[in-house]
Amino acid sequence: MKRIRTIAAVVAVAAVFATTACTSTPPGSSSDPSEKANLTFWSWVPGVDKAVDLWNKENPNIQVKLEQTPAGSSGTYAKMYSALKAGKGAPDLAQIEYQELPGFVLENGLVDLKPLGMGVESSKFVDWQLGQSTFGDSVYAVPQASGPMGLYYREDIFSALGLKAPATWDEYAVAAKTIHDANPAQYINTFAPGNSAWFTALAWQAGAKWFGLDGDTWTVNIDSDTTLKVASYWDKLREAGLIKTEPDFANGWYSDLQNGNIVAWPSAQWGGSILSGNAPTTAGKWKVAPLPQWDSTYASANWGGSSTAVLKGTSNAQAAEKFAVWLNTDPQSISLLLAGGYGWPAAKNALAGSTLDKPEEFLGGQNANKDVFKKSDESINTSWGWIPTTANTYTHLNDGFQAAVEGHGTFVDAVKAAQTATIADLEAKGLKVRAGD
Amino acid sequence: MTTTERAYTGKKGKNQSSKQPSTVQKPRKIQRSPGWRILVTAALAVAAVYFLFPVYWLTIAATKSTSSLFGSSGLALDNPQLLTNLVNVVTYNGGIFGRWALNSVLYSGVGAVVATICSLAAGYCLAKFTFRGREVWFNIILAGVMIPGTALALPLFLLMSQVGLVNTYWSVLLPSLVSPFGVYLGRIYAQAAVPDSLLEASRLDGAGEFRIFFTLVLRLMMPAAVTIFLFQFIGIWNNFFLPLVMLSDQSLYPITLGLVQWQSVSDRHPELYQLAIGGAFLSVIPIMIAIVSLQRFWKAGLTEGSVKG
Amino acid sequence: MVLPLVYAIYESVTGIQRSGAFGQGGSSPVFVGLDNYITALGASAFVASLGRVLLFAVVQVPVMIILATALALLLDAASAWGVRFFRSAYFLPYGVPGVIASILWGFLYTPGLSPLVNFGSALGLNLDFLGGGSILWSIANIVTWQYAGYNMLVIVAQLKSIDADLFEAASIDGANAWQVITRIKLPLIRPAIVLTTVFTIIGTIQLFAEPLVLKPLSSAITSSFTPNLSAYNEAFANNNYNLAAAESVLLALVACAFSFGFLKLVTRGGSPS
């Protein structure tokens, strides 16, 4: 076929061009920081645009071009992986959540930042967050922020019903019933079946530890009694019709927050900016309480911690490292990111005197960071780690949760199925794996 | 001959002389009572409401601020601010929307023109030249019509990444140049509309094969060309999977990808809802106007090219 | 066209072997035969997604074709006012790309935003467009909205090419409108109907953009809702390109089998008059 042959020829010619282009420009390893550099940076963190503007003003030689992307698991990780696979089109820098870092390391997609300066800078960061981006002897990302959890709730609606912020999950279930009984349109929260990262954080809080590494062998322990306890707790609320099961971060949910049909949200510190951005008319009516507890010892969890990583194929790894460290340690940058609501800083001593330590109008004047999140951050079980196929595990949980919501099986079933499927995922990657801790 | 082929060739013998059968002045309608007429019009009107309702909603929504988008009825105006919204759309992020629009036009325009010429040439070769494996090629093309384009997008990505073309204009353009349906249509049409005697005569006059194709055959196959062009243009314009897989650089995005990007970013940046809606409005309205005003060509192309062939 | 398929088949029989917790010990592609196909067909979610698009096709295709044919016949009857306006109105959505149509309808399906849901609840109806029982048909509605007008136009074009003498003869013979439709029009537009049917089958089996856009709005759409979604997810979220390639090949085979099967069926069913 003439046409196909022509195309084949064009492809071949283009391929030759591409190869010559590759060989004529050496891979970006030049390490002179005074050299001009143009970097692209993918991020979805609110407020990061202002920090980037500030950097660009102060560093005319290293210009960063920010591209605001959808949240990582909403397609941006897919784009990064495909660009890495293709060997081109990946950004120099990217936002990567902690649970996704091992996956990028496995695909050989990240630059080891330790020899570029992170080795020296690492003392600036909170240990456990630094641990999330350290694999073996390498540091693959600059920690940015974590998401210590708390309970956002509509204080006005709770107190009208004579409810206090629930201190335990049992009290939470009682509150769920009181709220729904008083007004059938109202629910305490939604169990978003498509957002298993949220469920994972709740299991984390309950004391579960899903993943580990024993020498070269990955361990998977998702279906532990602890996790099953959490799953069956939400199963009971769902079966009693006391919670919604609509997707979070979606129009319907925003609409429910706005009109008071959803009155609470066990969420992370960064959740406040989501609420204030999407339900502006409810300002002043929210408060934050510590996450409800399972036991007498206070425990919290992290949801949505994130880092800034330098991707393979960058034109200037040194400049990129410099920017990534600045972004996450410079006081001015941190306060811009805090204003956007990026989470809890990974840099040490960021609370005192910063914009974090002040009352918030949206929360009716509560200083939630000081009251709740500081202690929450200190009570996270920091031994939690991830596996290179965390995204698959989330998918399995999502699929199982969605099936349960549609009336096929339960959340407990979903957790059990995810255990088996996760072991198969790691095996499919050609890795060694076993069940248990 | 398959049935689809008959779809194109079914009427060829009869209508070759009259190019526009619809204009033949004969009483083709049987007159009905007014009651019947009202009934039919009512049925058509109900269908029209269904097809136009989302367009109406989009138009109303495009005039709203983000807060009244969520806080007011979707059917009525509420402090209309269409102009502000549209200015936001075209100026956001350094005018990236205009870039996406141009990209869409580039992918669709160039893709459709080249695909049309290639398809006609290939179809003509398949129809008028005998060479080894001709039927095999034609059957491959036929199978190509049946294979969903999206099933090929992923393999194409892997292939393009091998040759380093991913995330370039080429990665979306090259696959768009291939139109098995166009080749198929080209062959059917060439069989019917290009008389062998005319070719013989030109060859006797000493015209080269290329000249014959570009001066004579292309002209004869114009109606098929219009159909293939429009078909391919809309196909590329609407394509989503291929650019999604191929492109990671936002400045290469077509409109479809860009708007989905805005829509999915909006979970953390609520102001982008209004941009996504305003962008949808801006991109849909011109195409709708174009489609309706080009309806004549669609019809002509379909009648001449597909149905009558 | 042939090249990507061949390459897909090559990728689909390949797997990967690694050593070390992060593959530091090196990784290499290995020939795994039909393992990826066995994995794909052994995964209940992927098989369910194939079943889902087939169910979708079985319902969607007749609805689409009947609607398009009915609209074409009504327009052609020309007993109505404003035929030109109606024809344009029906054809208009064809210019709206699938993803944009999905964004649009997504808003119209969302409780709290949608005038349709509000209207329904005012009437005491609890309309749930995004739930597990209805989401597939909500998607079908988007597809129908987008393409019914186009299919109608193809059929209208063939109706126009019917020789007017036939109608004259029919009216002289005293045929009524229904007889004209069933005896003359329908048999003569059969080729156009076959054509639109084949294209509708191919279109429905490759369902991707609509569920992708609606996924964040609906709990019922999983990452493997359709075969294409599953392949996309395997390739780019899970980095399992080999499995994704196998799924693409399977999808192409199913689509081919269906379209050819349909063509065989109508060809054997006797030739149109």
Model-inferred region functions:
Chain A
Residues 1-39, 57, 413, 423-437:
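Short, low-complexity disordered leader/linker segments with a strong preference
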Residues 176, 217-247, 291:
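Glycine-centered hinge/linker elements that transmit conformational signals in sensory
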Residues 102, 270-282, 294-396, 433-437:
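C-terminal lobe and pocket-closing loops
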Residues 90-92, 120-157, 187, 297-301, ...:
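A structural signal for short loop-to-beta-strand junctions that line the ligand-binding cleft
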Residues 159, 376-437:
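Conserved C-terminal helix/tail region of periplasmic/extracytoplasmic solute-binding proteins
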Residues 57-127, 160-167, 256, 260-265, ...:
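Extracytoplasmic "Venus flytrap"/periplasmic binding protein-like
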